Regions:
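GST-like fold's C-terminal all-alpha helical module
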Residues: 2-130
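Long, positively charged, glycine-interspersed low-complexity recognition regions
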Residues: 117, 122-168
Length: 168
């Protein structure tokens, strides 16, 4: 999915509070491993580059802003669809709903202002989230909730919350 890196930017900044760094030794072993698949090796080097940059700079405000623009573009489309239908592909739950529920959950717990910007998406999300089957899948252990709260507080104090970095 073309938004994998973008959700990673949001999650690493707002959900994991600086956790998720790789040891330099482990990263070096991963970097030096060569497979017989050159395409896989290219993807691996992209991962290595991400973790090296993350170790030095964290997730930059510019990276978050670029990711938010991409998500807003997608949610603009979903908002229009959800004015006339219950789910993203129509009136029946689809794999698209399942995939976007996970993305939306990560953004929701990170402080994305769904209710203000995308009320139909917010209703769609909360309708799914209120169902036990969905809630059980994303209900994080207490330690992750505490880490997330720490990340939200520190980014808000530093004026680096999602709301502060949203595209104008």
């Amino acid at each position: 999915d073309d938004l994998h890196e973008d959700i990673r930017n949001i999650a690493y900044r707002y959900m994991f509070g600086g956790l998720g760094k790789k040891s330099s030794k482990g990263l070096e072993v991963f970097k030096n491993y060569k497979s017989s698949n050159s395409e896989l090796d290219k993807l691996k080097m992209k991962e290595v580059e991400f973790y090296e940059t993350y170790d030095k700079e964290g997730i930059t405000d510019d990276a978050v802003k670029q990711s938010l623009v991409k998500f807003c573009d997608r949610y603009d489309k979903f908002e229009g669809r959800l004015t006339n239908q219950k789910y993203l592909m129509g009136d029946k739950l689809s794999l698209l709903d399942l995939a976007w529920f996970i993305y939306s959950y990560r953004l929701y717990v990170s402080g994305f202002p769904f209710r203000k910007l995308y009320p139909h998406v917010s209703n769609w999300f909360h309708d799914l989230y209120s169902q036990n089957e969905f809630y059980k899948e994303v209900n994080d252990p207490l330690i992750l909730k505490l880490i997330r709260q720490y990340a939200k507080i520190t980014t808000a104090l530093n004026r680096r919350s999602i709301k502060a970095l949203m595209p104008k």
